[in-house]
């Protein structure tokens, strides 16, 4: 009996492991796995259904079909365990061994493994240094390959067709060896001397100059080193033994009616065995070569189809014309092993049902139908019934439950008490898609859900379904309660703002009760306290909206944890006083003394959480909800068609617009305007008309005339139901009301272009047939868009999760001093996001000083909370360096200081938090809200006039940043740099706005000047680019000859003459190479030099430049020598929404990207080539000049002699992130990508914290490219993991050797996921075949560091509570180590002890 227990205990237990290695299987290894050879293609006997001997289901090889019973039935039962029946040869064992035992097929002729042949780059091809085409010709018996040339003129590896082979035979006889087929390839692979080849390649690479050759050689070298290091032998890529999968993994099931359902693999194996047996027979018969050859080729094709059907040639199809599913198809794709069974499994103890609303529940509860609870908690109920003695056995308990006796319900209620259940709604886009609740038993069949958690689940009650899961173990229940309870998830992990926020009815109710009305019943009364207000309201003596005075007693918590009590009389309304009754102590009355719109309610809950804590907030949120529902019921808000008040002015506005359109039409007819201009004008006109109608409508709706206490008629905010819904933020918006009561306006065609004729009607008036038809256009496009968007957004989320899944907080502080420089985010001159908001929840990397002093006001290492934010804003700090995930130096994972605050909890992030996945979910979840469209800049947008001045919006002090300028005689400054900026700071020194200043801008203010709001501080001409002189002197023309390089023009209007420089192609032959310029000469006639350099001051003039100064004229500093006309930049389509986010994360290079200066120095233009200009930058430090050819059509922002800094824009266009990283570094790249992505989300009103984007960016920057290898084993141009290179460099520097130098590389998220260290994670993401092939050849080890790998091998993930489990496991093993001693050590110790005692 003891044996039996031990046996059951040790079944299939695996020793602990820390890594998984994948490699090539040698023939010996395949034979060692095998339990016998499959010799026949038979499967099972069609009459007896017993497996055939030596067939694909043979019981002798694979084990018995029934538990502990041999095939012929001689031995049955457990007592014969392990006996091998002498009659049928079957071992008596468990039937489940048929899932584990493998067999093999001895192949009559070697066969190349298709993965190593055809998966690009072909590994066999690389090793043999032959093209794939050539190898295929050898393998499929089209050509001979020379294996050993002997003493002949042939070369090893040379291909010979039949003709050449026979010629060679005639010429050389048996002196050489040439064969075809996989044996030839195997021979060649076997003959490769890895060590010798590696040495040869290492010598060859430094001596090669061509880039492509180096690439090819280093690829070969890498592969050879991989083979050498992994212990794989090259010839193992050619199979001589084929393993056979255990039969229960490729089942054959008899169906009714004598037919069988079978796995495709069986068919594929049968073909292989058939062909193999036939080949053996042919070889025994020594058949003609051509027949044998054909059979070998067919065998090769059969094995190819088994391993990866369809990889080469046409896929083999079954009886129903469907391609057969091969081994490779089993593991790849959504239905493959990885994604279907290993990463996502079905769960027991779960149920699903429709959800309905549970307005009476508390936040931590959900309503669970009794029937469902009974089924889910069955085992618990059985146990309880037995424990109580109500049932004697489990069977009896089962009967009781089935009969649904009254005792059962009592027991169920007891079992369920404080046993949380998990509720999940698909699609689970972020972690709030699964939360824990305490179940409350309800009648009926639908699950009841608390209204406040709907936002997190994105649930509504129009037929949504949700799933219930029961956490069984005590640990699971504990985690569900402590971490997943809905009451612990009040804040959104994406932005740290409350997600448990009332919406719709609740908002409407709260808004209604906090509005004020003029001359309502009880206006002007004064109340002693809130209780009195309550009594008077209930008695009906005062209306809800009456303006009254109330004495209130409030306790206000300050930020330091203290509290102040005070009593005051406030002007308020009855409703607000009633609402204050549910507000927790600690908050001031001012938070409710306003109409409670949605934003205000959200702010109130946020403040409540920060000031009084979690518990109070949860209670308060519930109370808010109850109150909101109560008062929205009382309000009786409903919509009737009369609520849509159409403005009287509408007809007049539309008539006027129609008249103007007619006028434009007649202009077009008479040829005064072009089609495009007409279109743009008409669309602008209608847009304006639409705005006017909606303005009139809103002013109509939002005000109503009432008579106040004194009998005077006054305006008050309207109580129109529709207006209240929109104003409170409960439902609808001004844009929607406009369509209902104003006019529908312009419609777009499916391709995005706007239709000229707008819909002038609204929904109250009704649409005509034509108008309805036009509007269907847009509506259908919207539906099609939504469907596409969902799929695209889901795929983006999947890629993000995959790239970031192994990023976990693993230590508290990595000790780095680096970080990102944070400044306020400015767009179009306005501060969109102040500094305070951006640094909230971050750790300061370096001390922050009070501006203008040496006093540290925020020390490094401070976690910035709301209190610090106020402090930073007050001290008018413009920039702060904060720790960031990008600059974190933790090797595996990230440190808590660099991450900062855990947004969902409001304190520093815990060790073990899976911040990568949270970041991916936060960015991916709102993806469905982003638009899919590309914005065509048409209509109004394309004709916004180019900016030509800076007009400040706020008064304040001028600050100039990074601006190179010269001062003109009249005291104005002229900008002579491109990156200059002008900012306006308020009285506290906080920047309010910031503007870019172009080259040549005339600035009428100086640093520190005070300006008033609305004043214009800078001007420039947007249509020309000036060349400004930086010194005074005399103008001298160089190479400017009329008719050859220049022409004079007289302006007809002004009568002034201008000199225009001719384009090179318009010049006569004599002027082609002359470069016209304007030189500055001093009074002594000598050339002047540019200030601070020894470069003569001469300005080369590009084609079409207009020169405005005469030869010999005197000019002063800041004067314009010439103007270069700018053709207005072409309107580019802006990629918006989801595609833009995907482009940024995939790090795609944009078309016609901007050109940046590669080095800092002086610009010059060299000799032009056809269609290209030669740009030369001479560095100031005297190193070699940098040259670049730029197409002529690119408009350049720089001219000869100008100084540029590395990374400055030379030609405009969309930025290329790779250029930014290379030239400006990681922090500039981070700033660019974060801002670009935030712009897309901000447009949709979605808030995401910057650190999530930085977290993904950290993963995209994992790799580096080796620039110089130093004394390391790296090869120049290799891409390596950053951590790997850093570890190696540390080792080298301790040994006083030369370290390798590297540059950072930016990878797109798909590429980064595929190039991760873990092959399990990469294989389960995409391109499974390629990943596994590469991993097997290089003998990769997966150290199971990420989450995905651990899920696949069925372990706890190394994050959250799992991290503690893993570290504890490792610690235990370290402690156990000394106790594990080998026998030889024991013997040695004994001998020593005996010897010493003997002396």
Curated annotation (Swiss-Prot):
Reaction it catalyzes: RNA(n) + a ribonucleoside 5'-triphosphate = RNA(n+1) + diphosphate
SMART domains per the UniProt record, alphabetical: RPOLA_N
GO molecular-function terms, A-Z: DNA binding; DNA-directed RNA polymerase activity; magnesium ion binding; zinc ion binding
Top-level taxon of the source organism: Bacteria
Keyword tRNA processing attributed: no
Alphabetical UniProt keywords: DNA-directed RNA polymerase, Magnesium, Metal-binding, Nucleotidyltransferase, Transcription, Transferase, Zinc
Gene Ontology cellular component terms for the protein in this record: DNA-directed RNA polymerase complex
Iron keyword on record: no
GO biological process terms, semicolon-separated: DNA-templated transcription
Residue positions binding Mg(2+): 460, 462, 464
Binding positions for Zn(2+) 2 per the UniProt entry: 814, 888, 895, 898
List of residues binding Zn(2+) 1: 70, 72, 85, 88
Oligomer status and interactors: The RNAP catalytic core consists of 2 alpha, 1 beta, 1 beta' and 1 omega subunit. When a sigma factor is associated with the core the holoenzyme is formed, which can initiate transcription.
Function: DNA-dependent RNA polymerase catalyzes the transcription of DNA into RNA using the four ribonucleoside triphosphates as substrates.
Name assigned to this protein: DNA-directed RNA polymerase subunit beta'
């Amino acid at each position: 009996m003891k044996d039996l227990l031990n046996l059951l205990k040790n079944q299939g237990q695996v020793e602990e492991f820390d890594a998984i290695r994948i490699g090539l299987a040698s023939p010996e290894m395949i034979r060692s796995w095998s339990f016998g050879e499959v010799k026949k293609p038979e499967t099972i006997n069609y009459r007896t259904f017993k497996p055939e001997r030596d067939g694909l289901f043979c019981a002798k090889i694979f084990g018995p079909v029934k538990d502990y019973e041999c095939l012929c039935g001689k031995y049955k039962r457990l007592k014969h365990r392990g006996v091998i029946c002498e009659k049928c040869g079957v071992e008596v064992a468990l039937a489940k061994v048929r899932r584990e035992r493998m067999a093999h097929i001895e192949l009559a002729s070697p066969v190349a493994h298709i993965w190593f042949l055809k998966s690009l780059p072909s590994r066999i091809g690389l090793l043999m240094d032959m093209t794939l085409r050539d190898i295929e010709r050898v393998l499929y018996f089209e050509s001979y390959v020379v294996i050993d040339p002997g003493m002949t003129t042939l070369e090893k590896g040379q291909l010979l067709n039949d003709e050449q082979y026979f010629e060679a035979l005639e010429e050389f006889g048996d002196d050489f060896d040439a064969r075809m087929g996989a044996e030839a390839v195997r021979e060649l692979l076997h003959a490769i001397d890895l060590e010798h080849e590696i040495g040869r390649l290492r010598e060859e690479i430094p001596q090669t100059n061509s880039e492509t050759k180096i690439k090819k050689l280093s690829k070969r070298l890498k592969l050879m080193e991989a083979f050498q290091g992994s212990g794989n032998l090259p010839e193992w890529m050619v199979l001589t033994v084929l393993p056979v999968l255990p039969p229960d993994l490729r089942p054959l099931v008899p169906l009714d009616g004598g037919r069988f359902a079978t796995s495709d693999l069986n068919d594929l194996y049968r073909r292989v065995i058939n062909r193999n047996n036939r080949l053996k027979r042919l070889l025994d018969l020594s058949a003609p070569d051509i027949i044998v050859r054909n059979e070998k080729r067919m065998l090769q094709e059969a094995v190819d189809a088994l391993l990866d059907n369809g990889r080469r040639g046409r896929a083999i199809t079954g009886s129903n014309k469907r391609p057969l599913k091969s081994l490779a198809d089993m593991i790849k794709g959504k239905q493959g092993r990885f994604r279907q069974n290993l990463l996502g499994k079905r769960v027991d103890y779960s149920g699903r049902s429709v959800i309905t609303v549970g307005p009476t529940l508390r936040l931590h509860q959900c309503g669970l139908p009794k029937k469902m609870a009974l089924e889910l908690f069955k085992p618990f109920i059985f146990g309880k019934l037995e424990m109580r003695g109500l049932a004697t056995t489990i069977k009896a308990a089962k009967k009781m439950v089935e009969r649904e006796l009254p005792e059962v319900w009592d027991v169920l209620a007891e079992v369920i008490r404080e046993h949380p259940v998990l509720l999940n709604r698909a699609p689970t886009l972020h972690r709030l898609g699964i939360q824990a609740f305490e179940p409350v038993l309800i009648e009926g069949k639908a699950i009841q859900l608390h209204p406040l958690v709907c936002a997190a689940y994105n649930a509504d009650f129009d037929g949504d379904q949700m799933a219930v899961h029961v956490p069984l173990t005590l640990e699971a229940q504990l985690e569900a309660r402590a971490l997943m309870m809905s009451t612990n998830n009040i804040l959104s992990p994406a932005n740290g703002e409350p997600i448990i926020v009332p919406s719709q009815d609740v908002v409407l109710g709260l808004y209604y009760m906090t509005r004020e009305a003029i001359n309502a019943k009880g206006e002007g009364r004064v109340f002693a306290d809130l209780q009195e207000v309550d009594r008077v309201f209930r008695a009906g003596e005062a209306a809800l909206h009456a303006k009254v005075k109330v004495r209130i007693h409030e306790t206000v918590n300050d930020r330091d944890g203290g509290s102040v009590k005070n009593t005051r009389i406030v002007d308020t309304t009855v409703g607000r006083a009633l609402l204050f009754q549910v507000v927790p102590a600690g908050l001031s009355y001012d938070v409710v003394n306003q109409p409670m719109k949605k934003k205000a309610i959200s702010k109130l809950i946020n403040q409540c959480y920060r000031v009084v804590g979690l518990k109070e907030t949860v209670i308060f949120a519930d109370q808010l909800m109850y109150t909101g529902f109560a008062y929205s019921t009382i309000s009786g808000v409903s919509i009737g068609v009369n609520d849509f008040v159409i403005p009287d002015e509408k007809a007049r506005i539309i008539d006027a617009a129609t008249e103007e359109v007619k006028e434009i039409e007649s202009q077009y007819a008479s040829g005064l305007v072009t089609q495009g201009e007409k279109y743009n004008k008409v669309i602008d006109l209608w847009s304006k008309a639409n705005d006017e109608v909606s303005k009139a409508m809103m002013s109509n709706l939002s005000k109503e005339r009432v008579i106040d206490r004194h009998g005077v008629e006054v305006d008050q905010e309207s109580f129109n139901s529709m207006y209240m819904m929109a104003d409170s933020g409960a439902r609808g918006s001004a844009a929607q009301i406009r369509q209902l009561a104003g006019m529908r306006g312009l419609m777009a065609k499916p391709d995005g272009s706007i239709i000229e004729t707008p819909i002038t009607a609204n929904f109250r008036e009704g649409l005509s047939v034509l108008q309805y038809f036009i509007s269907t256009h847009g509506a259908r496009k919207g539906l099609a868009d939504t469907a596409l968007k969902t799929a695209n957004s889901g795929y983006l989320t999947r890629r993000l999760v995959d790239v970031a899944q192994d990023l976990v907080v693993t230590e508290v502080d990595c000790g780095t001093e680096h970080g990102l420089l944070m400044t306020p985010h400015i767009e179009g001159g306005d501060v969109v996001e102040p500094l305070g908001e951006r640094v909230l929840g971050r750790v300061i990397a370096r001390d922050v000083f009070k501006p203008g002093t040496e006093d540290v006001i925020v020390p490094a290492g401070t976690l910035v909370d709301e209190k610090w934010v106020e402090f930073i804003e007050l001290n008018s700090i413009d920039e702060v360096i904060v720790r960031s995930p990008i600059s974190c130096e933790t090797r595996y994972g990230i440190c808590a200081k660099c991450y900062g605050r855990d947004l969902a909890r409001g304190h520093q992030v815990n060790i073990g938090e899976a911040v990568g996945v949270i970041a991916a979910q936060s960015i991916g979840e709102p993806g469905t809200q982003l638009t899919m469209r590309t914005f065509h800049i048409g209509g109004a947008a394309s004709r916004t006039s180019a900016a030509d001045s800076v007009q400040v919006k706020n008064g304040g002090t001028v600050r100039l940043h990074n601006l190179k300028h010269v001062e003109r005689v009249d005291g104005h400054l002229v900008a002579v740099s491109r990156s200059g900026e002008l900012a306006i700071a308020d009285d506290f020194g906080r920047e309010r706005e910031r503007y870019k200043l172009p080259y040549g801008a005339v600035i009428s203010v100086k640093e520190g000047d005070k300006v008033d709001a609305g004043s214009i501080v800078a001007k420039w001409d947007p249509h020309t680019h000036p060349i400004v002189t930086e010194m005074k002197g005399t103008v001298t023309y160089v190479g400017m000859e009329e008719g050859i390089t220049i022409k004079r023009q007289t302006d007809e209007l002004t009568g002034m003459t201008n000199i225009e420089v001719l384009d090179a192609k318009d010049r006569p032959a004599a002027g082609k190479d002359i470069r016209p310029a304007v030189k500055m000469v001093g009074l002594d006639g000598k050339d002047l030099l540019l200030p601070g350099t020894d470069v003569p001051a001469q300005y080369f003039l590009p084609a079409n430049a207009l020169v405005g100064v005469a030869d010999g004229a005197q000019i002063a500093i800041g004067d314009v020598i010439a103007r270069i006309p700018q053709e207005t930049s072409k309107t580019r389509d802006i990629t918006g929404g989801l595609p833009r986010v995907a482009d940024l994360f995939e790090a795609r290079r944009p078309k016609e990207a901007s050109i940046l200066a590669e080095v800092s120095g002086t610009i010059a233009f060299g000799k032009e080539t056809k269609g290209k200009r030669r740009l030369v930058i001479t560095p100031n430090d005297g190193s070699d000049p940098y040259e670049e050819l730029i197409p002529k059509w690119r408009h350049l922002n720089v001219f000869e002699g100008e100084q540029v800094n590395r990374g400055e824009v030379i030609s405009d266009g969309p930025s290329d992130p790779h250029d930014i990283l290379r030239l400006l570094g990681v922090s500039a790249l981070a700033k660019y990508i974060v801002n670009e992505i935030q712009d897309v989300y901000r447009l949709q009103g979605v808030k995401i914290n910057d650190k999530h984007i930085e977290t993904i960016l950290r993963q995209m920057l994992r790799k580096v490219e080796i620039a110089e290898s130093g004394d390391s084993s790296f090869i120049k141009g290799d891409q390596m993991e950053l951590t790997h290179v850093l570890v190696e460099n540390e080792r080298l520097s301790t040994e006083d050797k030369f370290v390798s130098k590297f540059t950072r590389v930016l990878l797109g998220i798909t590429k980064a996921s595929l190039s991760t260290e873990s092959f399990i994670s990469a294989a389960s993401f995409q391109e499974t075949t390629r990943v596994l092939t590469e991993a097997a050849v290089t003998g990769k080890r997966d150290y199971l560091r990420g989450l995905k790998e651990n899920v696949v091998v069925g372990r706890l993930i190394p994050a959250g509570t799992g991290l503690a489990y893993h570290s504890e496991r490792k610690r235990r093993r370290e402690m156990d180590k000394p106790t594990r001693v080998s026998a030889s050590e024991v013997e040695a110790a004994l001998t020593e002890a005996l010897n010493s005692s003997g002396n």
